Amino acid sequence: MTEPEITPELIAAHGLKPDEYQRILEIIGRAPTFTELGIFSAMWNEHCSYKSSKKWLRTLPTTGPQVICGPGENAGVVDIGDGQAVIFKMESHNHPSYIEPYQGAATGVGGILRDVFTMGARPIAAMNALSFGEPSHPKTAHIVKGVVEGIGGYGNAFGVPTVGGEVRFHRAYNGNCLVNAFAAGLADADRIFYSAASGVGMPVVYLGAKTGRDGVGGATMASAEFDDTIEEKRPTVQVGDPFTEKRLLEACLELMASDSVISIQDMGAAGLTCSAVEMGDKGDLGIRLQLDAVPQREANMTAYEMMLSESQERMLMVLKPEKEAVARAIFEKWDLDFAIVGETIPEDRFLILHGNEVKADLPLKALSGTAPEYDRPWIETPAAAPLGAVPEVDPIEGLKALIGSPSYAHKAWVWEQYDSQVMADTVRAPGLGAGVVRVHGTPKALAFTSDVTPRYVKANPFEGGKQAVAEAYRNLTAVGARPLATTDNMNFGNPEKPEIMGQFVGAIEGIGAAVAALDMPIVSGNVSLYNETDGVGILPTPTIGAVGLLTSLDELIAGEPQAGDLALVIGTTAGHLGQSALLAEMFGREEGDAPPVDLEAEKRHGEFLRANRKLVRAAADLSDGGLALAAFEMAEAAGLGLTLTPSGTAALFGEDQARYLVACAPDRAEALQAAAEAAGVPLQEVGRFGGAAVTLAGASAPLADLSRLYRRAFAEAIGG
């Protein structure tokens, strides 16, 4: 088949800038072949190379005594004691999910699960953080339903519990939804599998499903803005099969137990190209591939298509040669393809053969380690104008504005489509703060949360970045867990715009300050840029996924109070209404500065709660919606009314940080107050749980009426 001529138009269609193409010519000393152009395009795009963000990502704290492996591998690895490790990561599948919601979201789940089990871990938990356009937008309902169905369809069939996440709506996501998928797994700390190839002449083996044309160019598509050609990009979305993925998991874990694996890498973005280059680059080796050996499910596939296909449920492995028969038998047993498609070579070459032709012969290091890296111009986000006057509101009407909004309404419509109990180790399912999963066969448990408040980040990227980490810290602490580490999913607009790059830089600096202060190093992550449609960008959304440890389930703090329990707030309430949920939902105002985050107070208050967990019956962090929303959610989950005594809009709905709401039996309140005084931690009694009404500063409504609104608003908003 004749390959197309390399023209400026073809170069631009591959997402390469003229100066980048000139650099390619200088590196290889000639014009590239069509396949080589595709390989450079895939490896040098934002999705694979992080060329606009690498400079700043390097500044993040990534080490600590608990960290076994930080960023750079498929997922982060953290020690949880007793010879065990938790392996986790969060990454985006934003562009594919907007184009084809079901498959985009489903393959996002599949990809993050492979990142975890390719390192030798059995997945035990999943989460997802979803951002959609306003419910009235004509595309939103279709996207929401497709994304949720795709996540549930893949995760449920694979057999991993979905234990948490978040869902928000905002007009800034009308043209770009965000689908951030998280997965965590367990492995023996001394049986972690890495991706660096080693040894010359070692067989490179293709594992899993066959290669088709789905997803060709997916990584390049994910590194560009959308415009009116969006429908033409539908073929770049991958198609997933969770049952094949489940077989691939079992085959890989069995293979790993057979001492056959030198290195292993899943085929994700840019497929065979990226997995082979990463393995060779990390091992300082070259790779030779013979594409005639690649299992194909479609006829007449070209070298270009095979190298750039993003067909799902595939792995690439460097195998111990003497173990070929053992490895082949395992994959045949699981009815999966096993094919030797190449070998490691000593030269710094990426050599691609197809038929009797050399389709690509490139310096491998130039594709990865020496890919372009930019120091993009950026400008600091201007300080927000001071918040103007906020009228006093009827507290019940303020609460109704929040619980009647799909962003804050009960999310049962979403969670009920996810299996949260498969594997029978889920202790806390979605809906009550952080998810909690038992570490099977031990007294331990792990807690999981994902958090960010994009309004804050837009108003003040530094404080917004800090707050995302601080809220994750509080959510883990509120279930009794000790926060261990984090993964970041950085979703931003076009980095070539200095104001957008400034948001990114500010958020990174805030995240870095918070993870350092709270001992929650970043161990993995993902960057998704160019989340814009026709030049309109999303809210800056640096999602933080976090994991915490309970050494025993005796440390678990419940989420539901009992009738008669006192409501107390740990922390200081100043009544910060800037960028608050109440302001946005009741008045349509996104004004003022984000609330400041005192990291020392965050740590001190969190440590106080964990140290005094035996004195409280239930706990929740205070964030969006302030005291009123958190207290309502806690009471409603238990089927209880409540009475809050603080008066004034700011006291009830302010979003001051470093605060927790706790429910405490009356006979333990005195001991808790004494402990707070001894620790120098502010503690204020604010009300009581019980009854059949919700009373806020004297205004009252039946719990049943509010609960009905709270539990119906989400489905009604999207026509569910």
UniProtKB/Swiss-Prot annotation:
Could you give a single Gene Ontology term from the biological process aspect?
A: 'de novo' IMP biosynthetic process
Binding-site residues, substrate: S92, H93, N94, H95, R114, Q238, E310, S311, Q312, S528
Provide the binding site for ATP.
Y50, K89, D488, G525
Its pathway is: Purine metabolism; IMP biosynthesis via de novo pathway; 5-amino-1-(5-phospho-D-ribosyl)imidazole from N(2)-formyl-N(1)-(5-phospho-D-ribosyl)glycinamide: step 1/2
GO terms for cellular component? cytoplasm
* Catalytic center residues: H47, H93 (proton acceptor)
Alphabetically sorted, this entry's keywords are: ATP-binding, Cytoplasm, Ligase, Magnesium, Metal-binding, Nucleotide-binding, Purine biosynthesis
Compartments it resides in: Cytoplasm
Q: Where is the signal peptide?
A: none
Q: Which domain of life is it from?
A: Bacteria
Does Cytoplasm appear among the keywords? yes
State its role: Part of the phosphoribosylformylglycinamidine synthase complex involved in the purines biosynthetic pathway. Catalyzes the ATP-dependent conversion of formylglycinamide ribonucleotide (FGAR) and glutamine to yield formylglycinamidine ribonucleotide (FGAM) and glutamate. The FGAM synthase complex is composed of three subunits. PurQ produces an ammonia molecule by converting glutamine to glutamate. PurL transfers the ammonia molecule to FGAR to form FGAM in an ATP-dependent manner.
- Protein name as annotated: Phosphoribosylformylglycinamidine synthase subunit PurL
Q: Which gene encodes it?
A: purL
